[in-house]
Amino acid sequence: EQRLNYARYVYFDKNGFIRVFSLLDKLGTFLNELLEIRTERIKSHFSYFTVLRTMRERGVHPELTVPLNKLKEGCKESTHRLRRRRNTEIHYMNSEMHDDLLQQTRMYGQEVLLENLDQQLQDLATGLHMAVQSIRLTFQYAERMLHRH
């Protein structure tokens, strides 16, 4: 039963953090088009974070940029860990392979550190909160833009 629970955790955790970044990437594309940021001129493949940084550097739409940036900064540590996990998962190896490799290469008798599941769940919850609140702020701003025109 413990293995089954862990297998479920791994499936839903991976699915969760990949989907959080998928939401953010789609939001970045939406913001880029809505606000005519043209991030693709700087970087052909860009993320939400690239669009937000470009908005901040250009000083455009401060009534949206400031709260989005504040939200991002408030979730910085968790988001950084999620990004590192996502990049490891996509570009190198998944966390189970990483754990297996560490266990095989450690010296006998040393304490083996495994994934911190509680931390990972908290990071995922924080990342989801940031994504949902960023979407909310963006759509509220878009609605105000539509009413002005």
Segments predicted by a language model, with ranges:
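Acidic, Ser/Thr/Gly/Pro-rich intrinsically disordered interaction regions
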Residues: V10, L35, T39-H149
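Short, hydrophobic, well-ordered secondary-structure elements
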Residues: Y9-L35
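Charged alpha-helical initiation segments
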Residues: E1-V10
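Long, contiguous alpha-helical bundle segments
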Residues: E1, S22-D25, Q140
